[in-house]
């Protein structure tokens, strides 16, 4: 005959196994985050504001590097963080599933962010050239490309604003 203590321990073990299997069964298998946008105007305005903060900080750091106030290595660290933040915004725009009336504005904003990210990559190349004591011709070619990419980003940003419903 079974003792009370043995029956209680058996019941506790069965409850623990049942609870653990239930918890495991309830755990989500798809851990990807998705962006659900209900107000596309506020969403794109938020993206624009974050972009302005990131670009202002990065541009300021770039000027400080050019002026010799910070080292190229310090700038590269800052630029890589800025690039990562811009990439996050690009992903956010892509995953937002903009409606037909907002798609043009979102696509132009996306191109603006991509151009700015290319701009950041070119500034990193310039920082590496400064570290390596490259020739003036190489640096001036990169500076021209940097300005073109920055201007392209601004133009796409204006197109994004003008194409909003």
Where does each model-flagged region fall?
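Hydrophobic single-pass membrane-insertion segments
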Residues: 22-34
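Hydrophobic membrane-insertion alpha-helices, especially the h-region
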Residues: 8-24
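C-terminal amphipathic alpha-helix
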Residues: 33-80, 112-165
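Short, low-complexity patches enriched in S/T/P/G
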Residues: 1-8
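Short, solvent-exposed, charged loop/turn and helix-capping segments
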Residues: 85-111, 162-165
């Amino acid at each position: 005959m079974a003792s009370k203590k043995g029956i209680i321990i058996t019941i506790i073990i069965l409850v623990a196994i049942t609870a653990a299997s239930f918890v495991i069964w309830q755990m989500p298998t798809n851990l990807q985050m998705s962006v659900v946008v209900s107000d596309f105007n506020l969403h794109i305005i938020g993206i624009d504001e974050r972009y302005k903060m990131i670009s202002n900080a990065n541009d300021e750091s770039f000027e400080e590097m050019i002026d010799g106030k910070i080292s190229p290595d310090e700038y590269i660290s800052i630029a890589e963080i800025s690039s990562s933040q811009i990439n996050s915004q690009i992903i956010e725009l892509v995953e937002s599933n903009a409606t037909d009336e907002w798609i043009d504005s979102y696509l132009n904003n996306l191109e603006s962010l991509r151009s700015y990210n290319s701009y950041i990559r070119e500034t990193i190349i310039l920082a590496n050239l400064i570290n390596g004591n490259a020739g003036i011709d190489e640096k001036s070619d990169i500076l021209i490309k940097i300005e073109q990419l920055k201007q392209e980003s601004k133009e796409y940003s204006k197109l994004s604003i003008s194409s909003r419903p």
